[in-house]
Amino acid sequence: MAKHVAVLMGGLSAEREVSLCSGAACAEALRGEGFEVTEVDVDRQIGERLAALRPDVAFNALHGRFGEDGIIQGVLEMLAIPYTHSGVLASALAMRKDRARDVLAAAGVPIAKGVTVDRLEAAQRHILPPPYVIKPLGEGSSFGVFIVREDQAYPPQELTRSDWAFGNRVLVESYIGGRELTCAVIGEKAHDVIEIKAVGGGWYDYDAKYRKGGSIHILPAELKRNIYQNVQLLSLKAHKALGCRGVSRTDFRYDDRPEGTGELIVLEVNTQPGMTETSLLPEIAAYAGLSFGELVRWMVDDASCDR
C-alpha cells in the first residue's frame, strides 16, 4: 500500500506564493514516485486538519514564519506525524538570524560583522559604515532586505512605514563584496557549489530568485580547489552546528575582487530550501545524479519525529 504523504504548502507568511509553487512541484513529483498525496494549504486550523487526515508523512514545503521557524514542526511532533527537513530547535535557530549567527560563530564558522537593532533606530542613522545590509530577523526570500551603498546619505526610510510587516528588530551586517555562492547538504554530505549571478548585475533579490531567467547559475562554481572544498566543509559544519536534518542550503559571499579581502563568509543557512523549477537545491541534486522525484522520495524516506 502506498504511503500517504501530506504536502504542507502555502501558509501564512510573506513567502506564501513561493511555498505554493514548491508544494505543487513536490506533490507532482511524489505522485510520480507512486505516493498517495494530499496537498494541504496550511491555515490556523492545521492541527485539527492533520489530526483528521492522519497522513503517514508530512512533507514540509512551507517557507517563512510558522513553517520554517519550528512552529509547524512542533505541531507535527505533538501529532506524532513523521516529517521532512529539520526539527523544532534547528528550524527555530536557523530562522532567527541573530541566534543563528551566535551558534555559527561559536562553531568557528566565519560570519559578517553585524548587530541587531530596532528598525526605527536603523532608519535614523547609519548603524555601520556603509556599505551594509539590513535584514529582518525572521524572513526569507529577500523580503524586507536593503543594501545601503556608500553614496547613500541616509538609511532606507521604508523601515519607518506603518505597514512594515517584518518585525521590529533587524540585523545590520557589513556588506561583503564579491561572488554569491551556495552549497546544499543532503543527508550527511555537502554537494557541489553554485555561483549565482543576478541578470543585469543587480543583487540576488526576490525577482532574481524566482523569475525564470532572473539569475544565472554556474554549476560547478569556478573556484580554486581549496576554496571550493572550504565552501563544502563550512556548509556541512553549519548544518551540523545548528542541528539540521534532511536537507539544508548554505549561502556564502566570497570576496575575491582585486581590491577585496579574500574573505569567505557564511550569510545564512536555509532549512527549507526552495523546491520550485528555478530553485537551487533540486539543481544541485540533479548535478549529483539525483532526479527531482528521487530527491523527494529520499526526503520522505528520511522523515521522522524527534528531529
Curated annotation (Swiss-Prot):
Name the residues that bind Mg(2+) 2.
Answer: E268, N270
| Localization per Swiss-Prot or TrEMBL | Cytoplasm
Q: Which InterPro entries match?
A: ATP-grasp, ATP_grasp_subdomain_1, D-Ala_lig_Van_CS, D_ala_D_ala, Dala_Dala_lig_C, Dala_Dala_lig_N, PreATP-grasp_dom_sf
> Which pathway is it part of?
Cell wall biogenesis; peptidoglycan biosynthesis
* Gene Ontology terms: biological process: cell wall organization; peptidoglycan biosynthetic process; regulation of cell shape
Q: One GO MF term, please?
A: metal ion binding
Query: Does Cytoplasm show up as a keyword for this record?
Result: yes
Q: How is the cofactor bound?
A: Binds 2 magnesium or manganese ions per subunit.
- Needed co-factor(s): Mg(2+); Mn(2+)
Task: Enumerate the UniProt keywords alphabetically.
Answer: ATP-binding, Cell shape, Cell wall biogenesis/degradation, Cytoplasm, Ligase, Magnesium, Manganese, Metal-binding, Nucleotide-binding, Peptidoglycan synthesis
Q: E.C. number, please? A: 6.3.2.4
Q: Which HAMAP family match?
A: Dala_Dala_lig
Name the family the entry cites.
Belongs to the D-alanine--D-alanine ligase family.
According to UniProt, the name of this protein is: D-alanine--D-alanine ligase
Question: What is the taxonomic lineage of the source species?
Answer: Bacteria, Pseudomonadati, Pseudomonadota, Alphaproteobacteria, Hyphomicrobiales
